[in-house]
Amino acid sequence: MDLNNRLTEDETLEQAYDIFLELAGDNLDPADILLFNLQFEERGGAELFDPAEDWQEHVDFDINPDFFAEVVIGLADSDGEEINDIFARVLLCREKDHKLCHILWKE
């Protein structure tokens, strides 16, 4: 993989959010979708992190933080606070030539 051919942080967030919106209808309860849509403007967000350790339990490849990012999408108690109602955790490859993502959905 090429360090010079990675998505920027903003591109990573945007791509993860687009994937979330595309797949949410098939993976979240209708009540959660309604809540997310009603509250996202005021309390919603997407935050970028290095991949958490527990991803190794869900995928069978090496998660190099230089090439993978975790995007947490959900709602916070109020604007500016950390997301505490997580609707999806998206593991995304940041290398532009390797389209790979894995999502852990709210249960």
UniProtKB/Swiss-Prot annotation:
SUPFAM superfamilies for the chain: Putative dsDNA mimic (SSF102816)
Pfam families given in the database record: DUF440 (PF04269)
Known role: May act as a double-stranded DNA (dsDNA) mimic. Probably regulates the activity of a dsDNA-binding protein.
NCBIfam families the record matches: PRK05094.1 (NF003469)
Similarity comment: Belongs to the putative dsDNA mimic protein family.
Protein's name in the database: Putative double-stranded DNA mimic protein YPO2187/y2032/YP_1985
Organism per entry: Yersinia pestis
